[in-house]
Amino acid sequence: MQSIKEKLNPDHLPKHVAIIMDGNGRWAKSRGKERTFGHKHAIQAVRNAVNACNEINIPYLTLYTFSSENWNRPQDEVSTLMSLISETLLLEAEDIFSKGLRMHIIGDIKKLPPLVQEQLMQLVEITKNNDRGNLVLALSYGSQKEILNAVKQISAEVKSGQLNEEDITEEVFEKHLYTKDLPPVDLLVRTSGEVRISNFLLWQIAYAELQFLDILWPDFGKEDFFRCIYDYQNKERRFGKTSEQLDEQI
């Protein structure tokens, strides 16, 4: 019997997968532990997603690591998360490099602790020439603020005469987003059973397929990732067209 991975069509893979990694707290609570216990065990799920992407050659993976709203969580949890991010970057840096992955960071990283900022920039720098895949971490990220910042930048350029109002297009707007160097998202996955977007990549998921999984993030494995890709491949992406129009293009 074929595995899910073997059933995948290598000619119909998403170029960009984004994941809202949700459910760490509930996973820990179900085991009688503190929320931070779930965050620590979630690292293996991150490895699983990265390795799965690497195995089937999906070029872009974006992980919603820490949202701008997460700063409102209890201070001890935020501190633990920052320490965990720092430790994980140190532990995983060599593996990320050896896989040929290029690291990207999106979000308001100036709010992160100086040590974490430094580690992130070092990882971005040492992987900048890697070309076997792209790992994008969304840190201190909020899509509404990203869009608002883009509007402000464009407004300032119009006011200063650098840009004419009639020249503002979707492409121009996208060049002012954190994700200006990334392709649109093809598949958005959220774990934990919650059905919402949570201020994540609102512009970039305009035509993405959305999948909401009941599994909690620490339990997420490579087979779960491959199942998401399999389900994606069995959906018809129309981009506003009819099925008949798509058939005519084949």
Roles of regions detected by a PLM:
Residues 1-250:
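Flexible, compositionally biased loop and terminal segments
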